[in-house]
């Protein structure tokens, strides 16, 4: 039996959670935190959460559990979700008592982010100081640009859920807004790339960067839905760049990719694959083979979740009011609400704009207007770089829709001195020189993304606190706690769009020139 502990991080390196490598799985019990982060701060950060859905509540739970920061406001259009959020995550002292936003929550609950911005501007116009220090943006992906642009002039630190935006133009617009500050000084910025912050991946990065030079690696990301590289795997691409491009030590030079390529297509969810027995049915509720179909929306949302008392994700995605309906009116009423929503469908007379605008959760998977890949490969290549002292390497990423391992990640990394194989629970390191294989069992703290949700939220709050207390400047706090710059956030998203260009054009993309043309040259000149 081998029981080896990793050495402590050297000066300038990221701290790594205490993790033991052993041939037997360690106890799942975790040590209790002695006190909340920033408990000694004279003025812990005050937080605004925009969007009280799954992501907003995940981050709020981490903030409330692990930090001394205070959530003082929430902007959420669904009244039930807003009330529940206030009750769960905001104490009675939240808010400052000047007026009421009309929701019955004082200054704590707002029907939308614009309402909060208007209220905040009114306060400041009256000579009052800012009411919050930072905002978590957890709204729909396509709304990220307008929210971040609306917040930038207020000088708040921002944590935006991934993806940053749904188009390259919107990503560049967010980049410009936060870079230039909308007239305010630049602030700490983070993105919901939670894979960077789990104990598992922090250990994996240390093993990759500290034990051997990487030659090539294969990564797989698997999902049960028809995914896209942007919405489902932008943080996987970020994970690869974090693992293989960004320097492990402060002051080190990043090893930038040289070029990339991609192949992929929609293989399964096409009309040609539709079972003949389904006939002309376009909606699950009117389909003659609904009971035998593994993709039945009625079974997935209703029987598998709602009937078991779960009105949260994914059921509430169909209708955000279902949670309130279930708790106040009971299961029968909630099921009727769900079935009504699932029965909605479009016809040849439905305007194309309405078809694109609505999600149509009950639509037959083979009759939908889905055009995103359910199987895609991306190859990223680095060349020798004398400036950073890095050798050439290659990363191959495979995103697939069908797998037993739902939303889990597996990978194999080949280096000059050994290789690493990992899944969500273990990391195996094989040493070529000794022939010995060690198995590491990283800490499993629970919560979303292997502890990544909690890790991201607490690191962001610590960065905001360090700047607020005057212990660090924005740039230092950004690197120390967030671990990446605003530019690096945008680069990982831009690489997704570059990969899509490569796939559609059946071409190899030169990364430096693509970045210069599609991002740098789109930024407005400095005033």
Annotate the PLM regions.
Residues 2-96, 100-102, 240:
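N-terminal Rossmann-like dinucleotide-binding module
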Residues 2-19, 23-40, 136, 360-362, ...:
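C-terminal helix-rich "cap/oligomerization" subdomain common to oxidoreductases
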Residues 184-187, 194-355, 506:
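Predominantly a Rossmann-like dinucleotide-binding segment in NAD(P)-dependent oxidoreductases
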């Amino acid at each position: 039996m081998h029981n080896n502990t990793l050495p402590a991080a050297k000066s300038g390196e990221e701290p790594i959670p205490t993790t033991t490598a052993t041939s037997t799985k360690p106890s799942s019990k975790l040590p209790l935190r002695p006190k909340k982060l920033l408990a000694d701060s004279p003025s812990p950060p005050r937080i605004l959460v925009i969007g009280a859905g799954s992501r907003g509540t995940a981050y709020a739970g981490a903030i409330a559990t692990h930090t001394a920061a205070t959530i003082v406001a929430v902007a959420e259009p669904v009244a039930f979700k807003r009330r529940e959020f206030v009750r769960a995550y905001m104490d009675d002292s939240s808010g400052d008592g000047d007026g009421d936003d009309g929701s019955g929550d004082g200054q704590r609950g707002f029907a939308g982010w614009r309402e909060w911005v208007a209220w905040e501007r009114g306060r400041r116009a009256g000579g009052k100081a800012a009411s919050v220090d930072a905002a978590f943006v957890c709204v729909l992906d396509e709304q990220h640009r307008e929210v971040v642009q609306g917040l930038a002039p207020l000088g708040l630190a921002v944590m935006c859920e991934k993806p940053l935006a749904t188009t390259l133009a919107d990503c560049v617009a967010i980049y410009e807004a936060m870079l230039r500050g909308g007239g305010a000084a630049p602030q700490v910025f983070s993105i919901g790339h939670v894979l960077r912050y789990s104990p598992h991946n922090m250990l994996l990065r240390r093993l990759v960067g500290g034990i051997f030079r990487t030659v090539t690696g294969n990564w797989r990301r698997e999902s049960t839905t028809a995914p896209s590289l942007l919405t489902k795997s932008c943080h996987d691409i970020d994970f690869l760049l974090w693992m293989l491009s960004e320097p492990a030590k402060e002051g080190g030079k990043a090893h930038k990719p040289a070029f990339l390529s991609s192949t992929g297509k929609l293989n399964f969810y096409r009309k040609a694959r539709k079972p003949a027995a389904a006939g002309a049915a376009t909606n699950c509720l009117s389909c003659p083979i609904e009971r035998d179909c593994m993709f039945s929306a009625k079974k997935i949302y209703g029987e598998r979740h709602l009937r078991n008392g779960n009105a949260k994700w994914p059921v509430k995605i169909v209708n955000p009011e279902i949670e309130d309906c279930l708790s106040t009116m009971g299961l029968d009423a909630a099921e009727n609400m769900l079935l009504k929503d699932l029965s909605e469908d479009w016809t040849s007379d439905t305007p194309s704009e309405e078809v694109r605008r609505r999600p149509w959760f009950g639509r037959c998977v083979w009759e939908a207007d889905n055009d995103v890949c359910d199987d895609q490969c991306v190859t990223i290549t680095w060349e020798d770089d004398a400036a950073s002292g890095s050798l050439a390497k290659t990363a191959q990423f495979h995103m697939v829709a069908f797998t037993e391992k739902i939303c889990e990640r597996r990978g194999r990394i080949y280096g000059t001195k050994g290789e690493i194989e990992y899944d969500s629970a273990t990391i195996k390191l094989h040493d070529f020189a000794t022939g010995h294989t060690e198995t590491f069992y990283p800490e499993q703290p629970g919560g979303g993304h292997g502890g990544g949700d909690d890790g991201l939220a607490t690191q962001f709050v610590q960065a905001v606190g360090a700047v607020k207390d005057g212990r660090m400047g924005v740039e230092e706090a950004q690197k120390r706690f967030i671990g990446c710059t605003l530019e690096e956030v945008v680069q990982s998203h831009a690489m997704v769009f570059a990969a899509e260009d490569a796939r559609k054009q059946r071409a190899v993309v030169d990364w430096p020139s693509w970045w210069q043309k599609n991002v740098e040259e789109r930024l407005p000149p400095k005033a």
